[in-house]
């Protein structure tokens, strides 16, 4: 059989990404200005679109959860899940949140309460209440709904219908063979690859900044661009090795270890920190989150600093989740084979969101407690060092900081590790075992992307590029949802026979119901 594992999508995507890296290296200031102008335009004209889209995605997930399709198995009928529940949760959580969770659990609530606030005056009790509810909002079920719907589409078409693991293949019910084989399908897959590279490179950029600042804070290691490049190179070698060894050996092991370490820090801070204050903050924040769920979901201030806050936080986060959706979605689908749609949605939508709430309550409340009681000025700490600045004021602070630094490093590896696998799959005609050469190539490109982002403007440049990359791919997500609902509506009752037939391409096998056979 002819070897076709490396597709044209790989080479086209690689060329586009290389051109971007070269442009950023030669014209960094021009790139920074260009991305800032585009981001400003998108924020002014498309904020409403991002807010409505993410809310609609959440509604679709809930609808499917309670629909007659909820008991469909994402795989062959009667197939058992490949991974245990604890390993499954650990892998989807590590891939879905990664470095960002550690980066923002302290910095975001502090910023909402004492810096640029969403509604009330900074430093007031109302602003502190807002801080936790908006942190829950940004990292809660909205984010996981975006991941979940894309993952569900992939899992349904790949494991239930037997299509190849490509974004274009999921659009077959809408566009026919063109979506899977023609230029339009190739363009869609290239767009998915670029969105993934951008989203993951942004996380690598955040990770390099925080690891560098953590080393500087704890050990006075120099904090500069050179050190950040060194960190990216070292971690690139690590996650490339992990991706080379495969999901079961690499990602699964690292994810399990990292979740254990993350919970060690979480429980440790909960015990040595202001425990009662944390519990009260969590309860109050959860209540406010539920009470103001829809107002937060659809809130657009008229202008000024409040609109700037919306752009810097909510729109940025919604864009981040969308740009991460192809990567996280495909990875979650890959590790969710054998689960029912109901089990899948419940697991992906609610369990990780609750864990995020707990992390934000423990870390965020511990920081707010220090600030509000004038014990330490955490608000003046850099975003990258806010967590370390908080931990040092509690017993065992240095030990917890060391473990936190290790957690960030492993999150760094697991996020990029998962992404190299997904990028390899997208650029290898959906091959679930992409060539090591392809995975290594994407690891290098993501590292270069992250370096260019830091070089051209640090955190702000990263945020700008995420918002830009998410807009075109959001249209693809809408089409994927439409395609899923169309295909689900054609599902026969679960007692219909399934027959294995061959697709036009003899290398691709597809499961279809007897209804589809009649139609053909």
Enumerate the language-model features and the residues they cover.
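Membrane-interface alpha-helices at helix entry/exit sites of multi-pass transporters
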Residues: 48, 85, 123-131, 179-190, ...
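Long, low-complexity, intrinsically disordered cytosolic termini of multi-pass membrane proteins
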Residues: 498-520
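Membrane-water interface regions at transmembrane-helix termini and the short interhelical loops
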Residues: 1-4, 28-42, 61-80, 132-137, ...
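Helix-loop-helix module between adjacent transmembrane segments
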Residues: 2-11, 15-25, 58-63, 97-101, ...
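Hydrophobic alpha-helical segments of multi-pass membrane transport proteins
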Residues: 16, 49-66, 262-273, 355-365, ...
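Membrane-embedded translocation segments of transport machinery
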Residues: 180-182, 192-339, 346, 351-402, ...
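N-terminal alpha-helical transmembrane segments of multi-pass membrane transport
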Residues: 1-127, 267, 481-488, 514-519
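Flexible loop linkers connecting adjacent transmembrane helices
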Residues: 33-39, 66-85, 110-133, 156-183, ...
């Amino acid at each position: 059989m002819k070897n076709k594992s490396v597709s044209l999508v790989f080479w086209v995507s690689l060329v586009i990404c290389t051109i971007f890296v070269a442009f950023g290296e030669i014209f960094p200031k021009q790139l920074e200005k260009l991305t800032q102008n585009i981001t400003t335009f998108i924020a002014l004209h498309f904020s409403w679109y991002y807010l409505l889209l993410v809310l609609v995605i959440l509604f679709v997930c809930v609808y499917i959860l309670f629909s007659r399709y909820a008991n469909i198995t994402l795989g062959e009928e009667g197939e058992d899940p490949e991974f245990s529940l604890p390993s499954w949760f650990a892998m989807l959580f590590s891939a879905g949140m990664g470095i960002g969770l550690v980066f923002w659990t302290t910095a975001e609530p502090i910023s909402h309460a004492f810096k640029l606030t969403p509604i009330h005056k900074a430093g007031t009790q109302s602003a502190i209440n807002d801080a936790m509810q908006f942190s829950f909002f940004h990292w809660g079920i909205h984010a996981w709904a975006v991941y979940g719907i894309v993952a569900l589409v992939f899992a349904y078409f790949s494991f239930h219908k037997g299509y190849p693991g490509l974004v274009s293949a999921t659009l077959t019910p809408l566009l026919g063979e063109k979506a899977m084989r023609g230029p339009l399908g190739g363009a869609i897959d290239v767009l998915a690859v670029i969105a993934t590279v951008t989203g993951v490179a942004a996380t690598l950029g955040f990770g390099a900044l925080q690891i560098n600042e953590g080393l500087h804070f704890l050990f006075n290691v120099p904090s500069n661009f050179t050190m950040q490049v060194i960190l990216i190179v070292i971690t690139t070698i690590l996650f490339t090795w992990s991706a080379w060894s495969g999901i079961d050996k690499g990602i699964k092991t690292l994810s399990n270890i990292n979740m254990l370490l993350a919970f060690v820090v979480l429980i440790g801070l909960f015990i040595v920190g202001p425990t009662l204050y944390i519990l009260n903050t969590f309860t109050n924040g959860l209540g406010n989150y539920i009470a103001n769920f829809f107002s937060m979901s659809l809130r657009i201030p008229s202008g000024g600093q409040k609109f700037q806050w919306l752009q810097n936080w909510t729109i940025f986060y919604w864009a981040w989740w969308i740009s991460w959706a192809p990567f996280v979605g495909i990875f979650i689908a890959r590790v969710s084979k054998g689960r029912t749609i109901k089990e899948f949605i419940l697991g992906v939508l609610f369990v990780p969101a609750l864990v995020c709430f707990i992390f934000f309550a423990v870390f965020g409340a511990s920081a707010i407690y220090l600030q509000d009681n004038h014990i330490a000025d955490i608000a003046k700490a850099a975003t990258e060092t806010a967590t370390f600045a908080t931990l040092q004021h509690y017993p065992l602070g240095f030990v917890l900081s060391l473990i936190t630094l290790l957690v960030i490093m492993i999150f760094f590896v697991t996020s990029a590790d998962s992404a190299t696998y997904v990028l390899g799959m997208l650029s290898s005609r959906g091959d679930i075992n992409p060539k090591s050469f392809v995975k290594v190539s994407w690891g290098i490109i993501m590292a270069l992307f992250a370096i260019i982002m830091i070089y051209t403007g640090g955190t702000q440049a990263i945020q700008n590029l995420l918002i830009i990359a998410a807009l075109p791919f959001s249209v693809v997500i809408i089409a994927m949802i439409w395609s899923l609902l169309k295909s689900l509506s054609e599902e026969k009752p679960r007692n219909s026979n399934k027959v294995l037939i061959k697709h036009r391409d003899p290398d691709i096998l597809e499961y279809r119901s007897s209804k589809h056979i009649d139609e053909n």
